[in-house]
Amino acid sequence: MAQGEQGALAQFGEWLWSNPIEPDQNDELVDAQEEEGQILYLDQQAGLRYSYSQSTTLRPTPQGQSSSVPTFRNAQRFQVEYSSPTTFTRSQTSRLSLSHTRPPLQSAQCLLNSTLGAHNQPWVATLTHSPSQNQQPKPSPPNRLTGRNSGRVR
């Protein structure tokens, strides 16, 4: 790879790593949380650093529509860096979704369990958590899908 391509790739990586999903200015904030932490693998002289953020906003009803069904916008961002004497890995996942039901808040731990080695190694963690001040409603019962293909195994 040419030096110019490497520089452009590094610049894009830094931009991607530093720019979170921004909420729409017209949306009303419903829930927000952030988590950061560090895991040390003492026996491997390695470490993992992570950050997770989630925000849920309520979208306003478009002008001229009289819909009483709310629309929630959920933005999630998970970043992780793993560093050892022989390896450096950086990963980021962003997810943006719209739904008519309020999504539950998640924790970074469920995402860390999918990170190589994070779920089965002894670790020391530092965790900061800032939960939403808004009360979470009771979860609604799960919806059941019915139709031509429901219940059919392929």
UniProtKB/Swiss-Prot annotation:
<dbReference type="InterPro" id="IPR001964">
    <property type="entry name" value="Luteo_VPG"/>
</dbReference>
<feature type="region of interest" description="Disordered">
    <location>
        <begin position="123"/>
        <end position="154"/>
    </location>
</feature>
<keyword id="KW-0813">Transport</keyword>
<comment type="similarity">
    <text>Belongs to the luteoviruses movement protein family.</text>
</comment>
<dbReference type="GO" id="GO:0046740">
    <property type="term" value="P:transport of virus in host, cell to cell"/>
</dbReference>
<dbReference type="Pfam" id="PF01659">
    <property type="entry name" value="Luteo_Vpg"/>
</dbReference>
<protein>
    <recommendedName>
        <fullName>Movement protein</fullName>
    </recommendedName>
</protein>
<keyword id="KW-0916">Viral movement protein</keyword>
<comment type="function">
    <text>Transports viral genome to neighboring plant cells directly through plasmosdesmata, without any budding. The movement protein allows efficient cell to cell propagation, by bypassing the host cell wall barrier.</text>
</comment>
<feature type="region of interest" description="Disordered">
    <location>
        <begin position="83"/>
        <end position="103"/>
    </location>
</feature>
